[in-house]
């Protein structure tokens, strides 16, 4: 028997559907299929951490006062009572010690910000190494790079709002960076800070940027990113039943929705646990910002640390000409270098397509070992970044290990030029070696544990054909009619050798720039095609 409430909801739904006709679209959308591979959860962590940031940030906004007006602190934290400080710092202390749940909310917000940036970086790395940025998903790659840059801006703005000694030091550095820009730097610094540092308006201006402008743009980019994923369908790894024209996985309802909902609450629980148990950014220990004080061993959040490291490694180069000074030792590591790196990162899909001649649509992902040049580039970039992060803590390393800071700096200066190319070469050779291993398995099969005696009296181990899922993963195609290799001496197993040819594409493991390990041959690029209509399927 139908309840009155159910009848009322059904009637309301029918009334709405008669006017906007959304039932058919919703029914179709609920049947959409998403892949089940764990790596696709990395992007979801980014989304969930952003939701946590919005929720916790809204709570903090209710109690934070973005004012640089001087006040005398008389709150709960006894060591700072009677100290003159800005209203922004005083309100942050009040959130930490006097507002119920304020400190845990602050720490959840900070940990979620770190997780947000980490998930973006790891998600971009997954997309890069698997080739998920290739046609037709170049625009989504650009949106991801845009999210990364905006995340850096948003994190720095939020980190600067408490107006403590550590965040004030970061603002002082940013003021110097602005001054290093030729011609417009002085005017830009005065415009942003409202005069000579520390200025009177910087906190007032960072606040709307942090809570309104940048989050709004990030929300728009995330919405556009999800819309493109929904329209273009998900990429997937090669496997049984998976082709360029379908998606194998779980329907969005109920399986995927239940899994995604549980995963969100898991991320939220981890953030809550870290906010309650792991202290981060204890501003009461730093004290209010004072331009005459500098804290030793200060470190920014990890995603900004590479800029600190690049600045510390840069020699003290300045150019004096026509009565002006060009501070190249600040301009290059903090403005030019990140600009070049992020530009190359954004343009990479187009550069790869240009050099490889690949203009085809791709919905199946690459195995990193099968594109050794791209994988080597990614490993080289990671090595470059890690060296800069280490350089950002050269003073702490020198203090802990009792090593000369000059020795560390000069060593890292040499390493920044030598280590990344070495990592590239090693990674490329490892990828080619893994290709060789795959070809051996395809050719000879896998060991069976059975020993057979040949007519000549020799004992050999029998091999069996590689299981179909692994063969598909290595070759990218699914075929059951490939002949086993025959051998008169009995040494060849029932593998698939070099005979797996498919019309229209090369199924041999091949590298970037048409690279082939075994015989130096080149594989022709796939012919130009149109984007296939992707029909979802469930395994």
Model region roles, listed by residue range:
Residues 1-313, 332-539:
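Membrane-embedded alpha-helical bundles that constitute the cytochrome b-like, heme-associated redox core
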